[in-house]
């Protein structure tokens, strides 16, 4: 069983490590960030995590489309971090390993779009899968709370 995975790189990526029980988000994106001394990596211990919500992003362009899976990590002190999980170099097997590792982490995971249950069963490529998820999400429509008045 795989216990850790680096999605992306140590310049821009996300390490999920069940051995050390931590998530590290590497964000060494630009010289500007280094100069202004913004944090270049974010370390979150599993013990500090209240829950993780699995989200997606889809951008439809004129020349090509792009898709992304992100984790919205909510800590015990109610700080929220959006951490990208998929990058340009991400392969299908990497996404499957990410799902397996995060499921085995014993963290509270909220997966409102059923990405973890549907992706391992699909034959679609990643972008088409996210388009499918997006279509299903909007097909259901928006549910607004009822008001009295």
Where are these regions (language model features)?
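A structural detector for beta-sheet-dominated domains
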Residues: 7-8, 16-19, 26-27, 47, ...
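Anionic N-terminal interaction surfaces
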Residues: 1-42, 129-148
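Acidic, Ser/Thr- and proline-rich intrinsically disordered linker/docking segments
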Residues: 50-149
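Secondary-structure boundary/capping motif
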Residues: 21, 43-45, 70, 80
């Amino acid at each position: 069983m795989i216990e850790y995975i680096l999605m992306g790189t140590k310049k821009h990526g996300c390490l999920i490590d069940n051995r050390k029980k931590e998530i590290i988000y590497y964000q060494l994106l630009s010289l500007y960030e280094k100069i202004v001394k913004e944090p270049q990596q974010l370390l979150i211990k599993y013990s500090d995590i209240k829950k993780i919500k699995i989200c997606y992003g889809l951008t439809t362009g004129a020349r090509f489309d792009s898709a992304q899976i992100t984790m919205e990590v909510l800590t015990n002190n109610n700080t929220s971090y959006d951490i990208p999980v998929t990058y340009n170099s991400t392969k299908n097997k990497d996404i499957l390993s990410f799902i397996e590792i995060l499921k085995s982490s014993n963290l509270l995971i909220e997966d409102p779009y059923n990405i973890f249950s549907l992706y391992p069963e699909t034959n679609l490529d990643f972008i088409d899968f996210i388009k499918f998820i997006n279509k299903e999400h909007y097909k259901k429509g928006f549910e607004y709370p009822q008001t009295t008045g």
